[in-house]
Amino acid sequence: MPARTAPARVPTLAVPAISLPDDVRRRLKDLERDSLTEKECVKEKLNLLHEFLQTEIKNQLCDLETKLRKEELSEEGYLAKVKSLLNKDLSLENGAHAYNREVNGRLENGNQARSEARRVGMADANSPPKPLSKPRTPRRSKSDGEAKPEPSPSPRITRKSTRQTTITSHFAKGPAKRKPQEESERAKSDESIKEEDKDQDEKRRRVTSRERVARPLPAEEPERAKSGTRTEKEEERDEKEEKRLRSQTKEPTPKQKLKEEPDREARAGVQADEDEDGDEKDEKKHRSQPKDLAAKRRPEEKEPEKVNPQISDEKDEDEKEEKRRKTTPKEPTEKKMARAKTVMNSKTHPPKCIQCGQYLDDPDLKYGQHPPDAVDEPQMLTNEKLSIFDANESGFESYEALPQHKLTCFSVYCKHGHLCPIDTGLIEKNIELFFSGSAKPIYDDDPSLEGGVNGKNLGPINEWWITGFDGGEKALIGFSTSFAEYILMDPSPEYAPIFGLMQEKIYISKIVVEFLQSNSDSTYEDLINKIETTVPPSGLNLNRFTEDSLLRHAQFVVEQVESYDEAGDSDEQPIFLTPCMRDLIKLAGVTLGQRRAQARRQTIRHSTREKDRGPTKATTTKLVYQIFDTFFAEQIEKDDREDKENAFKRRRCGVCEVCQQPECGKCKACKDMVKFGGSGRSKQACQERRCPNMAMKEADDDEEVDDNIPEMPSPKKMHQGKKKKQNKNRISWVGEAVKTDGKKSYYKKVCIDAETLEVGDCVSVIPDDSSKPLYLARVTALWEDSSNGQMFHAHWFCAGTDTVLGATSDPLELFLVDECEDMQLSYIHSKVKVIYKAPSENWAMEGGMDPESLLEGDDGKTYFYQLWYDQDYARFESPPKTQPTEDNKFKFCVSCARLAEMRQKEIPRVLEQLEDLDSRVLYYSATKNGILYRVGDGVYLPPEAFTFNIKLSSPVKRPRKEPVDEDLYPEHYRKYSDYIKGSNLDAPEPYRIGRIKEIFCPKKSNGRPNETDIKIRVNKFYRPENTHKSTPASYHADINLLYWSDEEAVVDFKAVQGRCTVEYGEDLPECVQVYSMGGPNRFYFLEAYNAKSKSFEDPPNHARSPGNKGKGKGKGKGKPKSQACEPSEPEIEIKLPKLRTLDVFSGCGGLSEGFHQAGISDTLWAIEMWDPAAQAFRLNNPGSTVFTEDCNILLKLVMAGETTNSRGQRLPQKGDVEMLCGGPPCQGFSGMNRFNSRTYSKFKNSLVVSFLSYCDYYRPRFFLLENVRNFVSFKRSMVLKLTLRCLVRMGYQCTFGVLQAGQYGVAQTRRRAIILAAAPGEKLPLFPEPLHVFAPRACQLSVVVDDKKFVSNITRLSSGPFRTITVRDTMSDLPEVRNGASALEISYNGEPQSWFQRQLRGAQYQPILRDHICKDMSALVAARMRHIPLAPGSDWRDLPNIEVRLSDGTMARKLRYTHHDRKNGRSSSGALRGVCSCVEAGKACDPAARQFNTLIPWCLPHTGNRHNHWAGLYGRLEWDGFFSTTVTNPEPMGKQGRVLHPEQHRVVSVRECARSQGFPDTYRLFGNILDKHRQVGNAVPPPLAKAIGLEIKLCMLAKARESASAKIKEEEAAKD
């Protein structure tokens, strides 16, 4: 049977005024004069006004009465609210004494305002009434599917509300002290009140009896229809009475009234009938069961006679009424405003059903229909069809359990007949729900009605339950009543949409749990991918699952996941802590720890639950295993029992239901408690009280790292600055002084406490603080002078605990540092032995063997060192090779020599004086930081070094905020911040570039040059954006194009940031493209720019000629601090062989692609388990061997001596791999912020450990580990420390840093942690200097480890050589495509527009654009994307709150604002801003408040207050901005946020994402669209990899030069 829906809602502009008879008005005035108490006055007013109040006001009064009875509201508060409601209606009545006229369905004067009751009554009002004298007979609904001859009555008309006549009953009994009563008791109270108010009821019956024709009567009560029929005399009497009253109040005539207000008559008639008949019906039926709602709503069998409207008869009266209305004096402004406010407030509280909580004006509100010939539950259950026994059997009595039956064609509804779901907590709140349907025997699997027994008003439902899955996709759901249990089959047609949602949520829960079982590292985007690619079962009548499906059912899904975790062991990592579940919980605002009654809801049972045993065992070398086994000796538990007992102590938030329940007394933790007779040793919380909120908090603490890292004070230096009183008796010199230098006499040896020390020995030094360990140093000089006494020069060692390694370091290992100090000999404690452990000659082939012990035994005075340590940059390098000369052996200090050399390089100096002028001296060259600058060189200068002689238009600023219609855009108020993620408004300018014309020093007053004040005069170069053409010119020009100008500027030499090459394009021996690709820091110009005339000219000859400099290639280079500042051209062309590379966890090959572009690598092997990514790697690297196996299995094969794998692929052997790179996944141990026995076990078996074992076995020349930025912060940086510790133990030089990919030429913010390592004998690469400027907020790259801040060697912190790359640079040339575009190959339809696009397109012979495809989003998501404005910074907060027809034909609803948001207040129009009760003080979330299928996603305003208003979700990219970190699945509500195209209504395509990563257009991807997105999102941006590769290349060149020079020296020595 078709479900009945409420009529569509018409926008309400005003509330119709009530009309009171004169006698009622007079009585109200008398009440004001009577000396009544407030309570008595309110009671009398209610008695007088009750029948005239609007339905909405009555509902609110009922709600107030309920709150009073439940003692949720005080009597004073109740009286105040009732007075407010009555005054509201009275104020409207006083403002308008006449009804709005309605003619042929339209209101006069264009007034379309209607109240709720007026709208709902339209269905009956439009059907003409039958003659009053004709008796009515009930009519049954047709079952043959024919169209009904008259519209069905409105649900609002038939809604039963027995409490409307009992509002005053509480006054006599003391409302504040009254206890809550059952529904039956309230009904009895209703009867007594009706008896007392017979006169009032009689009057109401007399006024409304003739209007009862508008109400269809129940089919079961034809007798009542007769008793209710009026005689003609009674009608005439009533008509006379009304005429008399109308003459006094100028009310319309009865005919006019009947014509204009049929809806009001219907409403009044229904109210009268309900009051009259309610008690009699209640006596016939059980108090807790609803009335026969279907019978009440059956239309009559006979179609009533049509009554033609008589409009002309009332024409004169209409004209008089119109004239009276025009002459009525206008209301004062204050009254108008008050009335408007009243109207507004009434709109903010839409009426709800007091039973099921559904909105009464919801167009989707439906009413239950009973099956034909339905009977009550006891009668139904006794039907012989449901008996499973023969007539002779009496087995029923032998069962204690309730009988079980199947139920088909069922509907569930509340007392008022509204169809409602069973899973929203109504049953848990003791709301009585009933159902109807056809019951069948338990063995009958046929869902049809055949063979069933139809029942109605079954229940109420005591509980509902899920029995799991029937071996397939369908969940078995059941009800329990007091009489039986029912297993549900097929719902009725009207209930199918509601029940379908329940089946959907159960099936989605099954998908999620099964997905998390095998994907513990998954992200939210991965989960959405799984949901969207799962085909729904046929029974759900769904085409696809969407993200909206998951968010709609998030609370239920999370509860099921929590229940799944409860079934696990106490030491298991809960799967609800996976990254995807944490994101879902935040986004949907899920309440954790809700423990609903176990009997009411059971969890999905997994009969074949796969127990999570953690990751598979990692294959490790003995060295790697030894390090972990040693460090975690106390935490590794060999016995599983001990491991569980030593799990970390659980903490609780104390707020959620889980924390507040008592201990169970049954679990392992409880049995150990003293109160339950245990020992109390484990001190663990009850397993039933495992707090999900605290677990979430701890997991989140480890997930995101705050960008605003505080400045930490550096640790105190190891040396001592104080003098110590000397004891001459214990210190004596041995031998004579070696040399006397001024007051100092140098010695070779000294005797301290009978122990002889000599220069070069190592000692322990006493600290001032006795709690600190002894300091260790090498004695590099011994002397005595008259002022300080007996002294020595200490070159300090650094203990491993004082490095970034911290507690993971070897306690016997020391590190050299560039720190030294003069100390008194009396500070020496004793002599110690420090051994230098040099790498063995066969170091590269020793990988995987048993590690040799670095020291035999520990006598407390023997240590060793291998490496030198840079305390600022956390770099471990080979010790310096500086050797002393013969004449300074007695006082040579390596630290002093290195520090002096560095200071010399840093100090600017002038060289080669040219000319001495009056006020200055000219020079040809100058040095700074080891770099030589000559006249004619190009130099980088900071942006503030000089300005240009043209006034540029001010940078684009956000337009001032225009006033917004807050009713249409209710979430716009959340955009109070001007900051937009992905905006380049605060990006710095790139370096100024000049050509040195003069190097000079001004003269001092004595005529000598002031060489500490070096200045340079430069010719300015304009960039395209610096000319009058401004920023647009830069998009089409090459990024290294400049314009010469004759403008000059004088700049301090100290401000110079580096050297660059600027050439005239026509003078180049090769084309501009070849020149530009030949090395870094290369620029060219073709024209000169005249700022005065704003014109471009040919450059002058002196600009074209580089002067005496030639091209200045490679002259005068010293060793710089940053190798990136050097020109890349070597002095002698050296052919470098490419490194044989193994790429582990290669993905589609972004890292290898960057190394190939740098020209340093030949990737011969790659390991990638995920097949689509492995196939993509093969497509782009056809010469590589790609293994699609577990890396642990491959390493085990190699270590076992195998040369091929099971597929016959040749395995790389020891000595084959020269470079090892990869990005091991590390989310598996990121769930908790600190290590414990289980998380350590996960880490020990993680892929990071496997990767380190690869490094130890193969011992490559260079090693690179790439990972997410948080890799350096996981487990309080323990993962970082252990990784570096392994590399140091192997003998590698190593360092770590964080790089921003956006600074190396992509339009994307992507911070990545990089660990670099170089074998002994190689040079450890520096991190590449940034090439492009980028948003400062995204460039916080420092790392805090153990309260010490570490930075990398990067010096370009505030600017860079090139401008930032933008979204426009990236993809403005790509053709327009629509949502869901799927053509794999299309044409470009145009030339590249920017330098970046030219680089990525390359030189294709027949250009084809591949993978310009985008995800097909659901109809609702597509509608949201269409309504996101195109302005920069637009996101979900700019969505209008409107109804929209979706592409699938359905309608998206408006979002309802139903609660007062205490944080955000109300809108400017006074509208509410809250969508759930949790925004009100001290209230929890209301499951019934959830809204779905709305244009504004309900979950975002629900949780926005605690998540930065979800800024960026459904956000558009900005043409002049950049991408957020490209993820594996672009979702408008995912982490990446801004994934909408700047101008098109779709998410970004695969090719656009690939370009945001810097992949060339020729780079091939493999698989379906989601596979390709994942390949791109997981990759390392090739430009970043290229920049690192070029640094490695510099190190290889430096070593090659050293080898070449050493060879030349050997040859020269051999000749001699």
UniProtKB/Swiss-Prot annotation:
Protein name as it appears in the record: DNA (cytosine-5)-methyltransferase 1
Modified residues (Phosphoserine): 127, 133, 141, 143, 152, 154, 312, 394, 398, 509, 549, 714, 732, 878
PROSITE patterns (UniProt xref): BAH, C5_MTASE_1, C5_MTASE_2, DMAP1_BIND, SAM_MT_C5, ZF_CXXC
Modified residues (Phosphothreonine): 137, 166
Primary location class: nucleus
Record-listed N6,N6-dimethyllysine modification sites: 70
Places the protein is found: Nucleus
Motif segment (Nuclear localization signal): 177-205
Species name: Homo sapiens (Human)
Region (Interaction with DNMT3B): 149-217
Zinc finger (CXXC-type): 646-692
Cross-referenced SUPFAM superfamilies: S-adenosyl-L-methionine-dependent methyltransferases
BAH domain span: 755-880, 972-1100
Function summary: Methylates CpG residues. Preferentially methylates hemimethylated DNA. Associates with DNA replication sites in S phase maintaining the methylation pattern in the newly synthesized strand, that is essential for epigenetic inheritance. Associates with chromatin during G2 and M phases to maintain DNA methylation independently of replication. It is responsible for maintaining methylation patterns established in development. DNA methylation is coordinated with methylation of histones. Mediates transcriptional repression by direct binding to HDAC2.
Gene Ontology biological-process annotations: cellular response to amino acid stimulus; cellular response to bisphenol A; chromosomal DNA methylation maintenance following DNA replication; DNA methylation-dependent constitutive heterochromatin formation; DNA-templated transcription; epigenetic programming of gene expression; methylation; negative regulation of gene expression
Region: Interaction with DNMT3A, residue numbers: 1-148
Organism lineage: Eukaryota, Metazoa, Chordata, Craniata, Vertebrata
